[in-house]
Swiss-Prot record:
Protein name in UniProt: Cold-inducible RNA-binding protein
Compositional bias ranges of the Gly residues kind: 93-105, 114-137
Keyword Phosphoprotein found: yes
Keyword Signal belongs to the record: no
Effect on the protein of changing R127K: Inhibits translational repression
Up-regulation conditions: Up-regulated upon mild cold-shock and hypoxia.
């Protein structure tokens, strides 16, 4: 991970900007170990962003502060730490998995609704859950409901126990 510390994401590039142009602009801030302009796999045209990796993290920080918002080949560029940018993206994905937690809560209330014979109550819980669950949570919830409802939930619990028991036997 230490090798990515001096790596900068450079976005908003002109499609005409190449590695040499980026290196020329950024090299005044310090020793550069790598410059990559990301290209489309089929057309080999620039996709409008790239990465500049500095040998020294302090040089990278100086370059980021100085170059963010500046113009290169007629386009205003955005410069950010490469690691920070991908952290934000992965945090977004993890946030999407909150739908899984929503399903678990929905599963419990559905069980309660089922034992009282209140199918509508379970459905209402689903609607409330989808509102609080946020993105994609409702889709997961309804897809899971359609795959067997409470019985599916219980039987998967049984199969988990079965596989656990067989695992324990093999272990001894």
């Amino acid at each position: 991970m230490a090798s990515d510390e001096g790596k900068l994401f450079v976005g908003g590039l002109s499609f005409d900007t190449n590695e040499q142009a980026l290196e020329q602009v950024f090299s005044k801030y310090g020793q550069i170990s790598e410059v990559v302009v990301v290209k489309d796999r089929e057309t080999q045209r620039s996709r409008g962003f790239g990465f500049v990796t500095f040998e020294n993290i302090d040089d990278a920080k100086d370059a980021m502060m100085a170059m963010n918002g500046k113009s290169v080949d007629g386009r205003q560029i955005r410069v950010d730490q490469a690691g920070k940018s991908s952290d934000n993206r992965s945090r977004g994905y993890r946030g999407g998995s909150a739908g899984g937690r929503g399903f678990f809560r929905g599963g419990r209330s559905r069980g309660r609704g089922f034992s009282r014979g209140g199918g509508d109550r379970g459905y209402g819980g689903g609607r409330f859950e989808s509102r609080s669950g946020g993105y994609g949570g409702s889709r997961d919830y309804y897809a899971s409901r359609s795959q067997g409802g409470s019985y599916g939930y219980r039987s998967s619990g049984g199969s988990y126990r079965d596989s656990y028991d067989s695992y324990a036997t093999h272990n001894e």
